[in-house]
């Protein structure tokens, strides 16, 4: 979850990205309706969305790959912040070209904002026949304002709560956009994320009824404990206590964006967890807390730490693509 969590794959993944250039195809634009389900009143209030129609734009991206194409997609965030560049959600859509309806997955990145790992998984998913919408979280990449130190995960937990709320609402719109694509099976929508992306994904999975499949890698719950105990987040704790904040207040704030808090809403859905037995960033006890709260879904433990889990990258790619590609037993 920490900034240096690049998963050690930047060099490899950049090679996959280097050949990309904007294609000469025509841009696309249109409208999508977000229609709340009948379960919307049961959604926690801070994550609810009203019915709305929103515009989107697509721009084709050239790739040497076969079997899928790639588009840059943008649409307005349902949250308007003080920073205009953060109010547009930027995504990359990896679309399988085979005929028929395809499952589709929202892909979420790590804390450090190194997008290449997410692109690597998105490419693998698309090659496997699974549409992948890689969503860039608030204040990352093109959403980061110049000259202002504002982040989705901040030294001020109140800012972190606001950033995570916006992320979940953006993901909910992303799910609506995916469901509206003619090549997508709207009954088979999922979410996948690594580290911060896994935590955010688990929260979104519990909140958004349209998401029926969830895979969370190097993630966990009890996020206040992760933030408070991590030696690399000393500045966060120091700033909070210097402002007169208590540990109890800190934990109460983080509880509002902890996937464990809402995990009972995800029980009965299809899930897979991929975790590191010796994770020094997301302690195994925090992973187990989320696992228990979700109803003890299938979990794979790698004999690795948060960073050395790179040794299992190909196993992870295979497991993730199979999980989203193959129907559940009761669907086959």
Segments from the language model and where they lie:
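N-terminal targeting or regulatory segments adjacent to alpha/beta-hydrolase or S9 domains
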Residues: 1, 6-79, 83, 128
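Hydrolase active-site cap/lid region
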Residues: 202-247, 301, 311
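Conserved alpha/beta-hydrolase "acid-adjacent" motif
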Residues: 280-286
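Gly/Ser-rich "nucleophile elbow"/oxyanion-hole loop immediately N-terminal to the catalytic nucleophile
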Residues: 151-194
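Short beta-strand/loop motif that positions the catalytic acidic residue
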Residues: 266-267, 272-275, 279
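Cap/lid segment of the alpha/beta-hydrolase catalytic domain
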Residues: 107-168, 229
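Catalytic histidine-centered segment of alpha/beta-hydrolase-like enzymes
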Residues: 304-317
